[in-house]
Amino acid sequence: MNDFWQHCSALLERELTPQQYVTWIKPLAPVAFDAAANTLSIAAPNRFKLDWVKSQFSGRIADMARDFWHTPIDVQFVLDPKAGMRAPAAAAPAPASARPASAPGSMGGSAGNGAAVDAAVGAVQAAQTARANGANSANNAMANLNANARAAAEQNANARAAAEDSADLDLPSLDANEAAAARRTWRPGQSAGSNGNGETDSMYERSKLNPVLTFDNFVTGKANQLARAAAIQVADNPGISYNPLFLYGGVGLGKTHLIHAIGNQLLMDKAGARIRYIHAEQYVSDVVKAYQRKAFDDFKRYYHSLDLLLIDDIQFFSGKSRTQEEFFYAFEALVANKAQVIITSDTYPKEISGIDDRLISRFDSGLTVAIEPPELEMRVAILMRKAQSEFVSLNEDVAFFVAKHLRSNVRELEGALRKILAYSKFHGREITIEVTKEALKDLLTVQNRQISVENIQKTTADFYSIKVADMYSKKRPANIARPRQIAMYLAKELTQKSLPEIGELFGGRDHTTVLHAVRKIADERSKDAQLNHELHVLEQTLKG
């Protein structure tokens, strides 16, 4: 078992970045191997690490175990018993005077209930002693100790309530006393609440960052190169370059990956940086809970003191006036303190409905960057990179086939690849284009049914207020020719039709006419922000 783990650790150390290896793999330890049941148990030091390693590395470790023992191995992750150890109970209760008093407000281990338990044990002990000395003494002892037990229980309940207030607001994962102390005593260059033990875990737990999402594994192409460049600039100069940075684009295009990458970079560059990633829905929930519990002082103190706030999918603020008001104050405080704010949305800022004009103007005061659906070459690169991370050799022809048929977003591509890998493994077949077609049969059918050239023509005509018939006509005024070229471009991008087929559907035009339109619009899109925005709206409308 230990030989295997040394072998496994050595391989993972070569495959992962030093930060990933030290954070996730090094703290693990094999604790049991059952040869009869073919099960291997690996212990993690805490629940956070256990859940993350199980979701991210279990498949790779299981593959290594199978190769090592030449048989399938069920890899199970367990919590290290030492992590949950409590002080063993004494053989007999010690006298009350001999027992150390619990520290006021202590929340560590079982101390939360310790005072109440100690008082209850003492009450029983005193009552037994009192029987020998007379009923009156027993009654007096029991009355006194019951009062102590009630007081201890009340103290414990108050401590729990304070901790629940902090936890409910999704503030850093500290108990009430630690959280208050961290908010009071934090200084630049010092990690809040860090005591040197499990510091990396604490940083990630407090910041809510995903350490796997970095600039190194972000696939770059024309569709996202500007957004990536802006993100790197902000990570290098937080609070100075582009504040706020507003990234917008459809689902699964890499917005969340980029903002986590910024946070991870800053966490590495600046020891003790106060960083928080939060989804807009969670922020709304925090505002509601702060209102219910009258805890706005703690709420403001926490959010207003951050160095970097990463807020995802801000369109969820729509129509929520109290949340918008609190965020406006937080935004103003952060920018005034030269802290960085980064926001994502699925829509251009001015088109988010139900958002206060004050906030819209703040969003526009920094840099707004669109992330577009990935082009063909980028989709292929994403598939190849993802396959590599899964330790699978993917033929480039297969990657091109998938990339040609699935065009909308990265998440869809990764989901398709997982289906292909599962299908191939289940049927014991090599990944070929034929196997890929079988694995993605339902998905490809839906894709082909979703968007038609006719639908593109109608949607584009409606958008530019012309007649659908103008798409087929020979009319050449600019107000008709331009939308027609845009529709041809979209037909090439969003359907599987060939250039001659598209030309035929546009009034029998030659394929060279279609090619000219496609190249013209593609070139102008990269230079004209207004055209790029219009195309983005059309694409999102067509994709539903």
Swiss-Prot record:
It comes from Paraburkholderia xenovorans (strain LB400). Residues 425-544 are annotated as: Domain IV, binds dsDNA. One of its GO terms (biological process) is regulation of DNA replication. Residues 1-71 are annotated as: Domain I, interacts with DnaA modulators. ATP binds at residues 252, 254-256. The gene is dnaA. This is Chromosomal replication initiator protein DnaA. GO terms for cellular component: cytoplasm; plasma membrane. Residues 90-105 have a biased composition (Low complexity). Belongs to the DnaA family. GO terms for molecular function: ATP binding; ATP hydrolysis activity; DNA replication origin binding; lipid binding. The lineage of its organism: Bacteria, Pseudomonadati, Pseudomonadota, Betaproteobacteria, Burkholderiales.
